[in-house]
A protein has these predicted regions:
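Short helix/loop capping segments that flank catalytic or ligand/cofactor-binding pockets
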Residues: 56-59, 65, 88, 111-112, ...
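An often Trp-containing, charged/polar helix-loop segment at the C-terminal end
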Residues: 250-301
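Functional beta-strand-loop-alpha-helix junction segments that form "active/interaction loops"
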Residues: 18, 22-23, 110, 115-174, ...
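Active-site-proximal beta-strand/loop segments in catalytic clefts of secreted hydrolases
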Residues: 49-52, 103-107, 141, 161-165, ...
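Peri-functional-center coupling elements
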Residues: 1-45, 64-141, 250-259
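Residue-level detector of buried hydrophobic side-chain packing
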Residues: 46-48, 103, 126, 159, ...
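Loop/turn elements at helix/coil->beta-strand transitions in domains of secreted/extracellular proteins
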Residues: 42-45, 98, 132-133, 154-158, ...
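Catalytic cores of nucleophile-dependent amide-cleaving enzymes
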Residues: 84, 90, 157-257
Length: 301
């Protein structure tokens, strides 16, 4: 457990690079991946079911040792699943059309959830990949829980939230996406996991671009699993969420590439990998795992 936490702490720093993290990353690769390496063909999809401290680790960041050390994401598409039961029950991934439901840039009434500087930019970067007639966009005051719950959810193949998230470590059903308030009620701005599972969806991909704090976006692993589980139970084929703080600057770029790749026909798991690799192969600071590794996809087979 100590090596996982130490490695994660290294990755959480914006300056955490391959050079500064290779020792622990390679040790974890030898421990967790190498024993099964013969069973993993190059370029294959690898599904990870992790628990405990390992659920906080993005396996894509493990370092493949050798003459040219590199992150495992270079060799394989890494997918996560909350449980064997959910993995077995996963529906085949189909295209299912190009309709988008997008909610974000909510109005803040709580200082714990300040407004997000880059939310509007991220939303515009997503909108442009869909025909106007095929998208429903709820922003500012209209980005509220009722707008989601009252939508004809089953018609949307893509659902995307640009909002704060709050995790409940005691009850995953209390995890919530923070939107605009609909009334003076204390929690009218929260879209709870317990409500999400009561409203069936057929989305090919749900993306929870959850944010927390001024200029950073984060989501505790337990809460990510709670919300991912809720959307999967509701009928989503794949869910993308963030494991830790990410830069408010790099996320719009990553999402732009993700949706461009989806538009070009890549399946969600491949599209996310390609978006991450675009940052990893860039020349600036965005190549560090802090910027591309937080986002994880669940059940994208």
């Amino acid at each position: 457990g100590a090596i996982v936490q130490r490695y994660r702490d290294t990755l959480l720093g914006p300056d955490g690079s391959l050079e500064t993290s290779s020792a622990d990353g390679a040790a974890l690769y030898r421990m967790l991946v190498e024993p099964a390496k013969a069973l993993i063909p190059a370029g294959s999809n690898v599904v990870i079911l992790s628990d405990g401290v390992l659920s906080e680790l993005n396996f894509e960041t493990l370092v493949v040792p050798g003459p040219t050390p590199h992150y495992w994401i270079e060799d394989a598409t890494i997918i996560s699943a909350p449980s064997l039961y959910m993995l077995a029950a996963a529906k085949p991934d189909g295209d299912g059309g190009r309709k988008l439901l997008l909610l974000g840039n909510a109005v803040s009434t709580d200082p714990d959830y300040p407004e997000l500087p880059q939310a509007a930019i991220e939303m515009r970067s997503i909108e442009k990949h869909f025909a106007t007639a095929d998208e429903a966009v709820f922003s500012r005051q209209k980005a509220n829980p009722e707008s989601y719950l009252d939508s004809k959810l089953q018609q949307y193949s893509y659902i995307h939230f640009v909002a704060h998230g709050v995790a409940s470590l005691t009850d995953p059903l209390d995890s919530a996406i923070i939107l605009s308030p609909t009334s003076d009620a204390e929690d009218s701005f929260k879209l709870y996991a317990r409500d999400i599972i009561q409203h069936p969806i057929h989305a090919r991909l749900v993306t929870i671009s959850s944010c927390y704090g001024g200029g950073t976006r984060s989501y505790a692993g337990e809460g990510l699993v709670g919300l991912s589980w809720a959307f999967l139970r509701a009928g989503a084929h794949n869910v993308i969420g963030a494991l830790w703080e990410v830069s408010d600057d790099s996320t719009p770029e990553l999402m732009d590439t993700l949706y461009r790749r989806l538009e070009e026909g890549s399946p969600p798991s491949q599209a996310l990998r390609q978006a991450k690799l675009a940052l990893l192969h860039s020349q600036g600071s965005f190549r560090n795992p802090f910027y591309w590794a937080p986002f994880q996809i669940y059940t994208g087979l």
